[in-house]
Structure formats: structure tokens, C-alpha cells
Amino acid sequence: MVGKPLRWMMTNHLNQKPLSLSGIPWFCYVISIASTCIAVGLQWDISWHMTIGRDTFWTPAHMVIYLGGILGGFTSAILVFNMTFFDKNEGMNSGVKFWGFTGPMAAWVCIWGTVAMLTSAPFDDWWHNAYGLDVEIISPPHMVLAAGFIAIVFGAMLLTLVQQNRSNVSNINLYSWLYTYTGGILILLMVILTTEYSFTNKHHSLEFYKISAIVYPVVLVAISKSSKLKWPATIAALICMFHRCIMVWVLPLFEGQPLLAPIYREITHFVPPPFPVLLFIPAIAVDLIIIKSDKMNDWVRSAAIGFTFVSLFFVVQWYFSEFLLSESARNWFFSGHFNKPYWSRMGPYEFKFWEYDYRGFGPPIPLTPVSIAGLFSVTLIAAISARVGFWWGEWMRQVKR
């Protein structure tokens, strides 16, 4: 009795018309919502720690994060269940077998991500009980959590990408939009994970540009190479920026105050993240180079993207960061005066470029000044990152399982 309605809802989800909106299967929307929950919850959780301190596990921010994980895992489990028991022909043609079950590759990636996220919860609680408060975002339990939510977002990209690669002309743009949207969420996750290396005060240091050259070109190139939209890298970068700006503008609307010492500044509302980098500007160049150089060798294209990315990103962020530290940015739009946590001591250093990396433990670490030789090494890193992006993007174009 239960199997019939489930079979009616799920049968031939790739070839027939399942429950859908505008011809797009329901699971594509749900998995995109799951990715959004993860991104929103992560930024909210970081703001919660910067505003209130460590709280119970059952905070609303944590619940939004794990809602995203459970949505992604549950949706993927339904797809695996359907392909294993109801849609065996499709499973033989396009499924991936694991432990006797058959499902789309993207579903297995999401399920693994959900398991990792759920495993990280007790691990993180034990870590805090054993070692106290976190002084950095990057800790062993947080890396397990990060592996989980990156897997879910990557699985969401794969799920919508398969639909794009197998769809007809009538709805291919809708799949491409969902794919590019989840790609924008992946870029946002990279922004979140590198927060401590990319404070505005570090934008005149070589370390900031090295980190940016590692994480951004690879994703931008892969999205631009595999999406069938026009200007996909630019759209993904704008989606990332839009999400970040929404958090900058919305979080300070809600009241909050510190509950855990030491408290070095008065906080009355939730602390927003720093204003996002202007990644869409070099993303335009990435799209343009890929469009105009289709017949060129990928190594040459990677070198061109590496040089162009670093040139544009360096010039834009060098001067934009000066603006963000000025009095002109101390308003609700840019939030230049209100993005430091309550445990950060107040002082003139808040609005200056740092010469040292001030960590939560140990002595300050000197930051490397930007130089011509340093920018050359950053360009080389960006070119290698772009080349990996070409490999990744070419593989993504061929994914149909």
C-alpha cells in the first residue's frame, strides 16, 4: 500500500514527468534549498559566536545548518530507494551501485555528506568539553563538518548538472540556473572557510592574495566550463556576493549581546560578516577568456586566466579594502565599523591594515608585504588553480549518472 504512492511519485524521475515545477523535478529544488540552508546557517552561526559566544547545540543557527544536511540526505535516500526498488532499468543504465543499493552518483555524495555532518556534531561537543572554546574556525570537528556540507553542496551541483547534461532544449536553462546557483553557494562556502585569512585588514598582505588564488579560480573556471548559461562564473560570483550582502544587512537588525567572558566591546545586535570581496569583476574576465579562446590550449588559457584574475582582483581589492576601512564605509550598507566579535579588543588597529596576523593563541605572525615577486608567485598559483578548474569543468560536462 505504501509502495504504490511512493512509486507513483518517483518512478522514472529522469525520463518521465515527476512532481515538478516548470518541468523541473522536485528533488532539484529541494537539494538547492538544502544548500541554501547550509550557507545561511553557517553565516548565522558564526555571527552567533561573534555576538553571544558559545551556546547550546540547539541554537536556531545550528538547526538551520543541520536541516540543510538532513534535507540533502533524506532527498538523496529517496532517490536511491526509488532507483533500487522501483526503477531498476534506469538504475542499470545510469545508477551507481553501493552496498547492494543503486542510486545517482550525486545522491551518494549527498548521503556521505549528511553522515559526515551528523558525525561532526558529537565530535564537536566532545572537542569543546575536552579543549574548551574554539579560537579558530578551522578545527578538526569543524573540518569534518566542512567536508560534509561541501559534499552536500557538491552533490547538489552534480544532481542539477546531470539534469542539465541530459535535458532537452526546452528546460535546459532552468537546470543551468539551478546548477549555477549551487555553484555560487559553493563559492560562498569557500569564502566562509577562508574568513580568518581574508579579513579586510589583511587585504594588503600577500597571504590574502595567495589564499584567494588557490580557492577562487578553480571554482570559477569549473562553473564557467560546465554550465550552459551565458556568463556562468559571473552569475555564480554575484549569487555568492548577494548571499553575503543579505547577511551583512539583515543580521544587525536582530538584538543580541555577549554571554561569555571576556567581553571587550559593547554589542547590542548581531555582528555581521565583513563585506564580500568583489569577485564578480575577475569572474567577468574568466567568462570572457573561456568564451573567446575555445580553440586555444587549456594551459595557455589557464595562464591567461591566472594573470588576468590576479591583476583585476589585486587592483580592485587593494583600493576597495582601503575604502572599507575608511569612515565612508562605517554605515549599515558596508558595516565597516561593526564586524568585529565581542572578544576583540577595541583600538585604532581596527581600521588599519595589519602587519601581523593576530591569532587567538600564540604570538602575532608577521604578514608578508605585497611585492612584484610575490604577485608573480600568486599568478602562478592562480594559473594552476585555473588549470585544475578546466579539468574539473570538462569532467562535469560529461557527467550523466
Predicted regions and their residues:
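Aromatic-anchored segments of alpha-helical transmembrane domains
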Residues: C37-L42, A116-P122, I185-E196, L238-P252, ...
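Hydrophobic cores of alpha-helical transmembrane segments in multi-pass inner/ER membrane proteins
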Residues: G3-K4, M63-F81, M143-T160, K210-K228, ...
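Membrane-interfacial loop-to-transmembrane alpha-helix junctions, especially the N-terminal start
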Residues: G23-T36, F101-V115, V169-G183, K228-I239, ...
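Membrane-interfacial, low-structure loops and terminal tails that flank and connect transmembrane helices
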Residues: V2-I24, F85-M105, Q163-Y179, M396-R401
